[in-house]
């Protein structure tokens, strides 16, 4: 990759202080316009206190928004490798580098957080707070890609294997300004479930023919909490080769 931006001035900038690029602002404007067309107003507006998420929220220009900054939405901590190149990471943290490639769910950067850490700590804190204070409300939250992966892991009760499968599939990638819409309302019937059961993904994509950013919207999908029988557990175990 291009390491030219890893200058002394840049690597000493705290992660929370980075602003959006020009492309990032166009993506934020694009998803904001789409979101306003879907739903004019929300009951609560949450945003990570990082500068780039503040800028994203402002650029989205949601009408009458009153944003609440909350640190639970902050970016996943990348610890000691936050501002070093991939080559430096591989050289100076060879063992940790190996686990990053083989175990993206539980892998933790040196002095940083794993996706599982973010899920078990901050995502659960957020959902507990929303269940208590905003159970029947519509909420928009501007956060970061890995936090969104942890949110997906938690809300959909994904197994380790399913998370790993999605991590290897580009179709599940959280690209810049991706919008994950989780709902308790059945999009087909309008009936409300007791728990979140439906999700729709929308993301800005660049249309080469028009030279403009447009939003690509995936179909709604339904998910349910997986419950495994003894036989299901045995099948999972047998799918893994013994190591001893």
What are these regions (language model features)?
Residues 29-98, 168-178:
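Phosphate-coordination/substrate-recognition cap region in phosphate-metabolizing enzymes
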Residues 1-43, 55-58, 185-244:
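An N-terminal RHG(E/S)-centered segment typical of histidine phosphatases
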Residues 20-25, 112, 117, 182:
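Conserved AMP-binding/adenylate-forming core of the ANL superfamily
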Residues 38-41, 130-137:
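Glycine-rich phosphate-binding loop signature in dinucleotide/nucleotide-binding domains
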Residues 29-36, 119, 123-131:
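Generic structural signal for well-ordered alpha-helical scaffold segments
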Residues 16, 96-117, 222-225, 238:
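Short glycine/proline- and acidic residue-enriched helix-loop micro-motifs
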Residues 9, 158-190:
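Domain-level recognition of soluble alpha/beta enzyme cores
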Residues 135-146:
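Generic beta-sheet signal
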